Amino acid sequence: MQEYKKNRVSKVAFAYCMALLFMIIFISSTFFLTSKRHIPNTEKDQYALALRGSIITKDNFTITSSKQIYRAEIDLRSINKDKFDLFLKLFQIYSGISNDQVADIKKRMQNQKKRSYNFVLLQNLDSKQASYLKDLAKKLYIQGFFKAFTNNSGRVETRGLNIIEHEEDRIYMSKDSFTPIIGYTKMILDPESGILKNIGVKGLEKYYDACLSPVQNEKIQGLKDIGGNIILNLNSLQQKKINGCDLYLNLSLKLQKSIEKAINQRNEDLKANEIIVGVMESKTGRILALASSRRYDPQNRGKDLSVLNASAIEYGYEAGSVIKPFIFTTALRLGKIKMDEVINTYGGSYKLGRFTIKDDHKMDKMTMEEVIRYSSNIGMIQIAKRLNNIEIVSGLKIFKFGEKSGIDLPYEQKGEIPNPKRLRDIEKSVLSYGYGLKTTFIQLLAAYNIFNNDGFYITPRLAEKFYQNGRFTNLDDDVKKEKILSSEAAKTMQNVLINVIEKGTGKKAITQGIIAGGKTGTARIAERQGYTSNRYNASFFGFANDLNHAYTIGVLVRHPTKPYSYYAAQSALPMFKDVVDILINEEFLTPIQDNNQTSTNN
């Protein structure tokens, strides 16, 4: 009986012990499941920045593009110190860096603050280097080269070698060519990816920024393994990268470079503040070249901010005698003058208020056509007297002076034309030969194009089309075409301008087999204290045609400092001739083989 009781007590005690054990296991399990656990974070978002589009010339040269730039980082807690020399040797082999760069990495490591674990091994890696190093990182992870550690949040992780895309590099292959019209960009932080990207600031980069800018970054979202790599499966999210558009220009690289070279050579002699040259296809408004002597490398811009401006559209100036054909045409269109009419030019000297106006060609009388041919200021004053204030100002407005041309560049200035209500007689007189108004180079180019385009005004355009989503989109919808003059009036003025070159002030531009016309213009530069005696702008605007092609050409020489070069016939006109010769050499023009051709060599 006593033995039985003893066995029973033992069984009860065992049961209580087992119950207590199960309770301890249950409580421990509950605590473990509900407590903060030191396990790796299992989710990850990974971005790749979509790139800004390229800019491509008419002759299919990519002059601007973007590329991804990476950096290599490592968390120093992921690697044993005794393995670091081996790691650096492998890093050098895969990245292709020099011994000096390896030495620099070691030196920076020695100066690294003790509490700073994240260490940048190398910056400015290209895509090829990044690809090789990503392969190295994967191999080292698989081989267990990197060790796990507990981070500041109490989580266990293995970071190892990390290759990070950190910025988009904008590359200008043509260096300073096409500047300032191509413009430049600046970097900002993309809020989604945390990567530095480019936005347009000036020129075509600014005007077409919405098109060139990337549409959608690449995004991969999903669970990650212990090495930090995203596990791609049905539950992971993949968002496709959509880059910005590729912009195709009307500008020709070969023609642009040839004209820029000619500008440089000419300016070695003229010592001008700037020379601007534009070539426009007369029938379409397409700008084939728009060059300046004030160029810069968009990737290495200097401190002179004025160089960054596109003077062709941003610089307003009094143009001088190149305005005469528009006042002349207005009077002709309104029936105020006749082409066969003879006008008094007072022997080349005329009193205007307290000033005496003198002509270079001193003649008692001139035909109306000779007023333009010999650029008579006195003749233009007589013509202006026949126009009232509203007629003369409205005539300028018809040719789009005082409004933007609509060219595809930002920050275009519209110029200034006088208020007819406040225009005094003396102001109207000087207006007739190009003083008292402000215009821009591109306004004059577009206005002269009317004479070479059957009386039609057409918007000048630098870009032709863009490519995106597998298709081209033409930009012709933004081009405005408007009949300004009758065909007869345009033809009359075209012939008048041809005579300027063949018989008048433009003889230096005569080119055998090419139909060329245009007008010189020399004007003093206005400053705060008035007009200076030694600062001038010289211009020549006109056209050059063969049997099948027609081009409108403009030249502006800003403040040439060579003695007597301020006369347009000594500066802008020879530059015009250079451009015509280039157009022939580059096969844009073919001289007419005709014994009856009126143009002859000098």
Give the positions of each predicted feature.
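Beta-lactam-recognizing serine transpeptidase/beta-lactamase-like catalytic domain environment
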Residues: T62-T64, K224-Q238, I275-S321, F326-T561, ...
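Periplasmic/cell-envelope proteins involved in peptidoglycan metabolism and beta-lactam response
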Residues: M1-N300, I390-K400, A509-Q512, R528-Y531, ...
